[in-house]
Regions:
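Intramembrane alpha-helical segments
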Residues: 1-64
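Extended hydrophobic alpha-helices typical of membrane-associated regions
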Residues: 132-176
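Hydrophobic alpha-helical transmembrane segments
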Residues: 12-19, 43-44, 69-74, 113-117, ...
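A cytosolic-side transmembrane-helix exit/cap motif
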Residues: 33-41, 62-68, 89-96, 162-171
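Hydrophobic alpha-helical transmembrane segments and immediately flanking/interface helices
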Residues: 7-22, 26, 91, 136-155
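Solvent-exposed interhelical
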Residues: 1-3, 77-124
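Transmembrane-helix signature of multi-pass solute transporters
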Residues: 125-129
Length: 176
């Protein structure tokens, strides 16, 4: 990351953002922080996957993080939550036995799946609002709105899946 920053003269905050992302990924399960075992796994992953990763792409493409990116950040964060909850669902039994303190362990897969649908709905609603209320941006938010319907519809179709059946659950998570 440091060599990339030097070679391509990216913004001063490129390397610190990469470092934060790496530290969050490393300390998700590694001591001494062990974020996933202390109830911080979802928020750290949602931030890393929903804000830092798209932020890095945006930063590399545009040379800076500007208001267009920050307008998108709440929706990206919602999809970061969507991501982490989906990947936790098939592993809830192992997480419980391993001592992780995540939302799936605490509240169960049924409520967790409701949170998956909720987070996807929030992401879509944000993109709908951006499409309606912001027209001055160089970004056409309508495309975000259209593509946000894919995980929402797939998730809603999966509402009838027997979440107790691990094979069906894994199939649904792959679809999500």
């Amino acid at each position: 990351a440091l060599l990339f920053q030097i070679r391509f003269a990216t913004a001063w905050y490129f390397f610190p953002l990469v470092l934060i992302g790496n530290l969050l990924g490393f300390f998700y399960a590694a001591p001494p922080l062990r974020l996933a075992y202390r109830g911080f796994g979802e928020i750290s992953t949602a931030f890393a996957a929903g804000v830092l990763m798209p932020g890095m792409g945006y930063l590399v493409a545009n040379s800076s993080l500007n208001e267009d990116f920050f307008v998108l950040t709440p929706a990206f964060l919602a999809y970061g939550v969507f991501f982490i909850l989906n990947v936790e669902m098939p592993d809830v039994q192992g997480d419980r036995e391993g001592g992780k303190l995540n939302l799936m362990v605490k509240y169960g897969v049924e409520k967790g799946y409701a949170a998956v649908i909720f987070s996807s709905s929030i992401g879509t609603l944000i993109f709908v609002a951006l499409s309606i209320f912001i027209s001055s941006s160089a970004i056409d938010y309508r495309w975000f709105m259209v593509f946000s319907l894919v995980p929402l519809v797939v998730g809603l179709v999966g509402v009838g899946v027997k979440l107790g059946d691990r094979a069906q659950l894994i199939r649904q998570v792959k679809g999500n």
